[in-house]
Amino acid sequence: MKKSNVNIFFDAWVMFKRCFIISLRNPETLLTATLIPFFLMVLFGTVFGSISDVGDFNYIDFIVPGIILQSIGQASQYSAMNVTSDMTKGIIDRFRCMSISKSAVLIGHTGAGVIRGLISNAVIIITALILGFRPQAGFIDWLLAVLFLLLINITVTLIAVLCGMISKSVEGASGLLFPLFILPFMSSGFAP
């Protein structure tokens, strides 16, 4: 019997709540997803910002996009690890026995990962504003930036969920996504 779209939406909502509650019960998940980018912003914005010469603008304005992308990669690692954990512990097999949509589990993991990424992005932007980040953006520009961040968060989290599905261990899932965490450091996002 085919499930209706309402049932799929409800199943996805239940799986999202389950995944997000798991994140809340493991405070280190949210803490590391927010504290590491926070400390990187403070470190690069204050210590390295005072020794680098980027011309006529503030170094903090230069590094905010790189740290945001780095934090999205880091926050998505938890989605991959949670999917792999569910698969290795047999939780996905239990869900297969229930009458829930097969895609609801993946939508739930993706939604929780996107929320973690957006929380991390908000912490970075607030920290950057405190440290002197002064973007020349209007309301429409901010709205477009938030939509773009949402799209990047969704895309990277979907990649993380896929990596979590193909990984055989939680550690392997984290390792598969390490390039997403380190890629901004290898780009020109930190060095002018």
Where would I find each of the regions flagged by the language model?
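A helix-boundary/kink motif common to multi-pass secondary transporters
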Residues: R25, R96, S101, K168-S169
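Transmembrane helix-boundary elements of multi-pass transport/secretion proteins
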Residues: S4-D11, C19-K89, G117, N121, ...
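Metallo-beta-lactamase
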Residues: S188-P192
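Helix-loop-helix units of permease transmembrane domains in multi-pass membrane transporters
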Residues: V83-A112
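Alpha-helical transmembrane segments and their short interhelical loops
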Residues: K102, L106-F178, I182-S187
